[in-house]
Amino acid sequence: MIEQLFRLLKKQGLGLEDTQITEAERLLKLAAVATKAAAVTLQLLQARDGQTDQAALVAFTPAEIDVLSAINATLEGKTAKQKNPHPLTSLAAATWIIARLGGWDGYASSRPPGPITLHRGLQAFAAIAHGFALGIDLAFRAGNVCIP
């Protein structure tokens, strides 16, 4: 587990060792943020097989879970083998979605997604979630949102 954490923090993941920050305090803050991001990736890695019953709320906000649900519909195929096999509110379901965004093909017969695939998926998800939030904000400003 520790080896995977360091792998995520270094070249193949967050590139922490390539930073040009020289001030100790700033470097410490960057390391803390990077470690949090790597820890989320490792949480997803542990949940990918659905052997834990953790809720997606341990790693994502309610708004992010809404975005994950919307993305899930676009990533699932037409056959049962191409569907997310986990309950949508579980961390395992979130892992399946994030892995698909990271380039995993979604088939159980394929090699399971690793930490780098999940890291790439989290990067893609962050961009999508940001765009989703901007879209909602713009709709509210324009008065185009009706809340029941």
Q: For each predicted feature, which ranges?
A:
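Single, function-defining residue in the core of a domain
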Residues: 1-148
